[in-house]
UniProtKB/Swiss-Prot annotation:
It comes from Klebsiella pneumoniae subsp. pneumoniae (strain ATCC 700721 / MGH 78578). It is found in: Cell inner membrane. It is a peripheral membrane protein. Belongs to the ATPase gamma chain family. GO terms for cellular component: plasma membrane; proton-transporting ATP synthase complex. Keywords: ATP synthesis, Cell inner membrane, Cell membrane, CF(1), Hydrogen ion transport, Ion transport, Membrane, Transport. This is ATP synthase gamma chain. NCBIfam families: ATPsyn_F1gamma (TIGR01146), PRK05621.1-1 (NF004144). GO terms for molecular function: ATP binding; proton-transporting ATP synthase activity, rotational mechanism. The lineage of its organism: Bacteria, Pseudomonadati, Pseudomonadota, Gammaproteobacteria, Enterobacterales.
Amino acid sequence: MAGAKEIRSKIASVQNTQKITKAMEMVAASKMRKSQERMAASRPYADTMRKVIGHLANGNLEYKHPYLEERDVKRVGYLVVSTDRGLCGGLNINLFKKLLAEMKAWSDKGVQCDLAMIGSKGVSFFNSVGGNVVAQVTGMGDNPSLSELIGPVKVMLQAYDEGRLDKLYVVSNKFINTMSQVPTITQLLPLPASEDADLKRKSWDYLYEPDPKALLDTLLRRYVESQVYQGVVENLASEQAARMVAMKAATDNGGSLIKELQLVYNKARQASITQELTEIVSGAAAV
């Protein structure tokens, strides 16, 4: 019965692992609901800011802010939003693959890339592949605040203001639903013109009080901060959804493995009993 004992030990081990993955699935489901609420609360502000900026980009402005002007591209920057923890399926690696493909396209044109990382998984990955990480923030937890993001955002905006960057993007996972999270790369600077057909057919003249430069400086920075924050909360909701799905799959796979091991155990036990009976019958026949 040595084989049967070993199989029993494997079954017990899988059952213990299954309990852990089931608990993690339930925790992720609870955190996902909270993350979705936070995402839904911030999304209207981010969307409205995007519309306002779309108006500005299409407007006839008396003061042309540097964030509105296209430049010859020699260096681009990416604010990359990843997770601090693993066990969330292919969420991070799918995002990294998309970014690496875009970085290669820039590299083929002779354009260099700077990276500001939000999340420890992105930091470790891009350090390992030789990415130029110029800023990072990790360990923000399940309730990130805008103040925690100011560091990387400030570094990239300062580089853009000084002409060391010619384009700036935010890279994150967009939450569609529990089963679908899409890696996205969104241009922040220079401000992209709105894709709204109505806006393209019209133009606006703006009057600024008191000073257009001061107003636009504040508004455009708020816009960048709001889009990065929205990317973070969307990525957090995506993380919890992906983890819940991954842990459910692990729990289900554990159940299937237990059934297979139980079948192997029953066969081994049956073979052992058959062998013992054969030995008894053979011994009786010999007598």
